[in-house]
Amino acid sequence: MRQLLGTLSLLGLLQCFPAVVSAQTQPASAAPSDPIEQVIAAKLMTAYPDGQFRSEQFISRAELASILVKTFKLDKRASAAKQEVISVQDVPSSHWAYNDIQTVLKTGIMKGYRGDMFFPNQKINRAEALSIFAQAHGVFQFPNDTVAKILAKYPDSGNIPDWAKKSMATALYEGFANTDEQGNINPLNPMTRGDMAYALSKFLERQEAPAPLLEEDLPSPASLPIQ
């Protein structure tokens, strides 16, 4: 009887071992894999007070300015320390994004309109937003044939304005731009919060694993559908 009890006790202990090993091999914490979760965790974007992210809502120019300042620490750049205030008629000092708008203007990352207008509430299309994002990140000085090779991978790249092609090539090369199921960039569509979350999540990933700067390693289009 004593031998039987000992055997049963040993079997019970052995059954516990896999659970213990499994618990020990689980990572203490895992980085969020969803783009929205990533950018919220990084405090680059926030959900609304009701807890919704509203990924299909359009990004405004003021929101883009605020996101860029936080992401690329534009306020730490030497040009942001200029003492003179840039006159912007439609952005009073009481505006929630006043400081960020001053920063993107002083650093030259974003431009005003008609001299002294910013249009902070105006939505911005994907070509503009991704090009500006690439400017803040740093545009690769690809030769024209490399730019053409990158853009040729996307069926609707002909819709990208000429002024944005080099910046868009950087954004696409770095994987910042999501595409629809056909691989289209949709450069003239409004930039959404979901699009921006995707770009930011890829930027965060690039901090850990930079893209190879080799022409033969040009990436395929990102396959995440556009929000």
Regions found by a protein language model. Name each.
Residues R2-S33, T46-A62, V69-Y98, T107, ...:
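Feature responds to low-complexity, polar/acidic, surface-exposed segments characteristic
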Residues A169-A171:
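Intrinsically disordered, low-complexity, charge-dense segments enriched in Lys/Arg
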